Design a protein with these regions (language model features):
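N-terminal hydrophobic/helix-forming segments and targeting peptides
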Residues: 1-156
């Protein structure tokens, strides 16, 4: 695979919702380590300075955020489905049936699907109304809250 395409894929698929940008930051630092002096600080700012002739140094500021919109686990229901809240601007109707990843407390990614109540179970009002996050859950294939705890999925 073309290295430029691979780089785009790696950065596009890196896990980085707000507050959890470490994977993106590490990827960026690794990507430029041969051409830049790199360090970060306690506020998760990353600094990259081209390795070059200090006498002819030009300073350029590239200001960008590393985080992406995401979700945070709110609760694990007794049936094993997961209630969640948005991090950033989401339209709930656009994520139904979408694949998501949950980062557990061991740093493992658990695959899930955003699910809603089947249309034939909805009231007339809900069927024709807008979708809210309260109407959605994440299904990771667990049959109970205990199973999700065994997967080390926790809520905030």
């Amino acid at each position: 695979m073309n290295s430029k395409i691979k780089r785009i894929i790696d950065f596009s698929t890196a896990f980085g919702p707000s507050g959890m940008e470490d994977e993106v930051s590490k990827l960026a630092m690794e990507d430029v380590k041969d051409i830049c002096e790199v360090h970060d600080d306690t506020m998760r700012n990353t600094y990259m300075r081209f390795k070059q002739d200090k006498e002819h140094e030009t300073t350029i500021l590239l200001d960008a955020h590393a985080d992406e919109v995401g979700f945070i686990v709110q609760a694990i229901k007794p049936n094993g489905t997961i209630r969640f809240l948005p991090l950033g601007g989401w339209d709930p109707k656009n994520i139904v049936s979408g694949e998501v990843w949950i980062l557990n407390d061991k740093g493992e990614k658990i695959s899930g699907i955003v699910a809603s109540q089947p249309v034939h179970f909805l009231s007339e009002e809900k069927r024709n109304g807008k979708v809210d996050f309260d109407d959605l859950v994440i299904d990771v294939g667990a049959t109970s809250a205990h199973v999700n705890m065994m997967k080390h999925i926790r809520f905030s």
